[in-house]
Regions:
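A late C-terminal transmembrane helix in Major Facilitator Superfamily
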Residues: 238-276
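Glycine-rich segments within core transmembrane alpha-helices of 12-TM secondary carriers
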Residues: 27-52, 254-265
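C-terminal transmembrane helical hairpin of 12-TM major facilitator-type secondary transporters
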Residues: 183-232
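Helix-to-loop junctions at the C-terminal end of transmembrane segments
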Residues: 169-183, 272-273
Length: 318
């Protein structure tokens, strides 16, 4: 599943989204995808639960196998639709010179991708989102164990943060990037600043804080997270990453950016086991530090974006 899903499907769809819109539309393209992806995940989860209940008839293993078979069938149908309905030489919003036969990716292109500063900036932005997302997952038990929120309310808000904020944050980030800032790098800077502020506030909240205030803050953390997640791959044109190596760039950024998933949850769990309630403060401080790193990466992205824009302007004037 990791090979077929993460390796093959994910990279192809990321490049496909980039090809769907022009450079000026990248924020909205990825933001809308993020929202639709969240909606589809939520919808399919409920559908699969229904299939498990109907097909299993009390047998959990049979129900689970039936749900897996349905998911596999949907994946197969989706792949066939793309194969037969998508034009072979589709270019959509990408520039024709970037997708010609002469520009097929080579080993040299793979190596070149590692040398592009924007690829590493994108990887750091992904790293920061993944880490902040892990920190946010501990806000639910923190709100109940330390701040005194009802467990039912905290769990409900956690679900809304995961799905509802995804539906709102992705398109909002894309709109801000394309229409307000005219720059994904600047929108990423806003998102990282929002993560810093919202997580930082939890560090100073006293026990017994108003439930209404906690609900608002938990949702704001979710919005801040998805302002970052919805657009971090759409930063590629600003970073001077050519369309024909887009999938390679995403692969590098994903490989590096998702490394925190390998250790942060274990580390956070150890802190809570060792320090109790004080362990949550360590987690929040780690989140604040990560957000600072994200701000630095976003500032570098803004600088790099301006440098790339000046270079393109000079080339056009020549």
């Amino acid at each position: 599943m990791a090979l077929t899903g993460g390796f093959a499907f994910w990279l192809a769809i990321m490049k496909g989204i980039r090809m769907t819109g022009t450079d000026e539309e990248q924020g909205r393209m990825y933001g809308i995808f993020e929202a639709l992806n969240g909606f589809a995940s939520l919808l399919l989860s409920f559908i699969m639960i229904g299939i498990m209940a109907i097909a299993g008839k009390g047998d959990l293993v049979t129900g689970f196998k039936s749900a897996l078979a349905c998911m596999g069938g949907l994946s197969l149908v989706s792949g066939l639709l793309v194969l037969f309905l998508m034009p072979k030489n589709a270019q959509y919003g990408s520039k024709p010179e970037e997708d010609t036969e002469s520009n097929k990716i080579t080993v040299k292109d793979y190596l070149h991708a590692f040398k592009i500063p924007g690829v590493w900036i994108m990887a750091i932005l992904v790293w920061c989102y993944v880490t902040v997302s892990a920190v946010a997952s501990y806000l639910t038990p923190y709100s109940t164990d330390v701040l005194g929120m009802s467990a039912v309310v905290a769990a409900s808000i956690g679900t809304i943060r995961t799905y509802g904020c995804r539906l709102a944050g992705g398109p909002l980030g894309g709109f801000l990037a394309d229409k307000t800032f005219k720059s994904v790098a600047k929108e990423q800077l806003l998102g990282q600043l929002a993560c810093l502020v919202t997580i930082g506030i939890f560090l100073v909240l006293p026990g017994g804080t108003s439930g209404g205030l906690l609900v608002v803050l938990l949702l704001l953390v979710g919005i801040a997270m998805f302002l970052c997640k919805g657009t971090y791959f759409s930063i590629q044109p600003e970073m001077g990453i050519p369309t024909h190596i887009s999938a390679t760039a995403v692969a590098i950024a994903t490989l590096i950016g998702y490394l925190p998933d390998m250790f942060v949850h274990t580390m956070f769990g150890n802190w809570i086991d060792q320090y109790g309630a004080a362990g949550y403060n360590k987690i929040l401080l780690y989140g604040v530090g990560t957000a600072v790193l994200g701000i630095i990466a976003a500032v570098l992205a803004v600088v790099q974006s301006k440098k790339i824009a000046k270079r393109k302007a000079a080339e056009q004037a020549a």
